[in-house]
């Protein structure tokens, strides 16, 4: 089955430049400083932020705080059952990508000698898992009240016969389709994460990057609304 | 989440439970409020989410797998379920990395023991055996999303919920060349103008009214408690993991597993008392689950369960 039908629709009925519905809930984990549950359609991610707290000697940095990320997926999250929820090569790679991305978003100099833990759990994976994790983490950090340069937003985009498609599902994330995951701050021109999978012709690169940037801005709009609504809901507790 | 409470607080808690009053107003045999939702994950064959007292949060997902095995190697039929408990780092930063693996494996092993005779206990589980050498393997995976005590209890409720939600496809087994068999999904024709592969596959469900459950019974002071909160878990002298299964023939309860957990000393008589408390509690839980499973409204697939 082709990814875009002759009438210009995708398998789930979306247009090429349309993202899936984003649903969120903030602050559901009582043990964590900040937490977020986020859905991109059928991709469901849970993120918790612990800290900043005094870090262990091995991780301590004198001038800024250390960011520790852990990405794991439940064994039943994908199409096939996995044996291990974390520790495989792909999860470790995604953990490192998230770590590096959020090191450049969080104002790490504000918390010298401390540590912030970010834990992402993919409850159900239906494509764009890394992008969903970035979005969930941004909101969880905002919920924890950790100072950031802005809210980071991410999107995964692919290209089919010179046409970009955004927010891929797992059925669209095939082995041949080139896909780019891009994360920016506040939907502006500040890229914090970029990852390309599979082979892409260099002429198509700018097309995909433009589509990804535009999608990041769209996703940012959604996340900003969520953060503002949450702040409004918390206003009586904060006392103003 | 690590809990630190002072000696005086512990003393208050212990003398309280010895008079059958707990800090949150429960008696020793009471459970916290249980929230049970089924059909929460569209990507699984059966799923369930259980919350205990709004803080312990467990998600169970079942994936079916067609497994081939060597019948000559198994003296008696092996039960088809396998359990895996994973502590998500979301629950507490102490579970990050390999932090939760040991406790998770301990609980998984206890479930494996509690369910070891499930072919005899669950009335229609033997239907998962399809043909000589082929069976449905039921992978039950649990993810602990939030932790506030009594994880095994929450897990066993989630397992029962997920097993009752599980839909197993009906298959037709036909002999094939070379002594092998061919297994084809059963698609009953109901008329209408549909191609064969568009007819929905017939499904059957497990009967879970006698499904084993694993309960923790803890000794605090001289009292026995079920469903401990994190503060109470700090004061535990010794804890037993007790597997209880309803016996449908004599209307009583069978003990399928007893495991001491976390060290400590126990007298023989205490073990007797604790298993009695477990089977009494199980009676209440079976009733509550039965009621819930009957009255729960069917959700549309893919609804947002944590919202």
Curated annotation (Swiss-Prot), chain A:
Disulfide bridge positions per record: none
Signal peptide (from-to): none
Record SUPFAM superfamilies: Ribonuclease PH domain 2-like (SSF55666), Ribosomal protein S5 domain 2-like (SSF54211)
Main localization (coarse): cytoplasm
Pfam families, per database record: RNase_PH, RNase_PH_C
GO process terms (BP): nuclear mRNA surveillance; poly(A)-dependent snoRNA 3'-end processing; rRNA catabolic process; rRNA processing; U4 snRNA 3'-end processing
CDD domains: RNase_PH_RRP41
GO MF, one example: RNA binding
Subcellular location: Cytoplasm; Nucleus, Nucleolus; Nucleus; Nucleus, Nucleoplasm
One cellular component (GO) term of this entry: nucleoplasm
Keywords: Cytoplasm, Exosome, Nucleus, RNA-binding, rRNA processing
Function: Non-catalytic component of the RNA exosome complex which has 3'->5' exoribonuclease activity and participates in a multitude of cellular RNA processing and degradation events.
Family indicated by similarity: Belongs to the RNase PH family.
Record protein name field: Putative exosome complex component RRP41
Name of the gene: exos-4.1
């Amino acid at each position: 089955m082709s990814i875009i039908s002759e009438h210009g629709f995708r398998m789930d009925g979306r247009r090429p430049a349309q993202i899936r519905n984003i649903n969120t809930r903030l602050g559901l984990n009582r043990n964590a400083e900040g937490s977020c549950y986020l859905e991109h359609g059928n991709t469901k991610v849970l993120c918790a932020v612990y800290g900043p707290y005094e870090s262990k000697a091995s991780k301590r940095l004198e001038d800024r705080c250390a960011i520790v990320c852990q990405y794991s997926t439940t064994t039943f999250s994908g199409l096939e059952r996995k044996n291990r929820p974390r520790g495989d090569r792909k999860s470790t790679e995604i953990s490192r990508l998230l770590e590096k991305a959020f090191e450049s978003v969080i104002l790490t100099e504000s918390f010298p000698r401390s540590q912030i833990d970010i834990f992402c759990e993919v409850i159900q994976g239906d494509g764009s898992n890394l992008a969903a994790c970035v979005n969930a983490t941004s909101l969880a950090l905002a919920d924890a009240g950790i100072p950031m340069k802005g809210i980071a937003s991410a999107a995964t985009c692919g290209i089919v016969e010179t046409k970009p498609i955004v927010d891929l599902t797992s059925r669209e994330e095939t082995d041949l389709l080139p896909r780019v995951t891009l994360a920016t701050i506040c939907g502006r021109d500040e890229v914090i994460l970029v990852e390309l999978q599979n082979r892409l012709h260099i002429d198509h690169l700018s097309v995909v990057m433009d589509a990804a940037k535009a999608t990041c801005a769209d996703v940012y709009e959604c996340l900003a609304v969520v953060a503002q609504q949450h702040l409004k809901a918390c206003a009586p507790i904060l006392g103003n | 989440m690590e809990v630190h409470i002072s000696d005086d607080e512990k003393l208050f808690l212990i003398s309280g439970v010895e008079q059958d009053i707990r800090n949150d107003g429960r008696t020793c045999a009471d459970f916290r409020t249980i929230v049970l939702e089924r059909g929460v994950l569209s990507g699984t064959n059966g799923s369930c989410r259980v919350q205990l007292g709004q803080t312990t949060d467990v998600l169970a997902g079942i994936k079916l797998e067609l497994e081939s095995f060597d019948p000559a190697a198994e003296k008696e039929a092996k039960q088809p379920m396998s359990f895996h408990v994973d502590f998500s780092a979301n629950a507490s930063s102490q579970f990050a990395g390999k932090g939760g693996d040991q406790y998770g494996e301990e609980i998984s092993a206890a479930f494996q023991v509690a369910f070891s005779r499930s072919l005899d206990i669950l009335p229609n589980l033997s239907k998962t055996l399809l043909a000589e050498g082929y069976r449905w393997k039921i992978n039950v995976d649990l993810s602990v999303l939030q932790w506030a005590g009594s994880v095994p209890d929450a897990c066993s409720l989630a397992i029962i919920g997920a097993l009752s939600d599980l839909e197993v496809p009906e298959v037709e087994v036909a002999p094939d060349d070379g002594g092998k068999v061919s297994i084809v999904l059963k698609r009953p024709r109901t008329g209408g103008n549909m191609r064969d592969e568009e007819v929905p596959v017939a499904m059957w469900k497990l009967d879970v009214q006698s499904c084993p459950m694993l309960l923790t019974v803890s000794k605090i002071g001289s009292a026995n408690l079920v469903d401990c909160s994190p503060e109470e878990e700090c004061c535990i002298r010794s804890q037993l993991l007790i597997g209880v299964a309803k016996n449908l023939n004599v209307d009583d309860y069978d003990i399928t597993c007893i495991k001491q957990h976390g060290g400590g000393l126990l007298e023989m008589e205490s073990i007797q008392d604790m298993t009695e408390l477990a089977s009494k509690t199980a009676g209440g839980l079976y009733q509550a689950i039965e009621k819930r499973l009957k009255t729960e409204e069917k959700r549309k697939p893919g609804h947002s369960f944590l919202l």
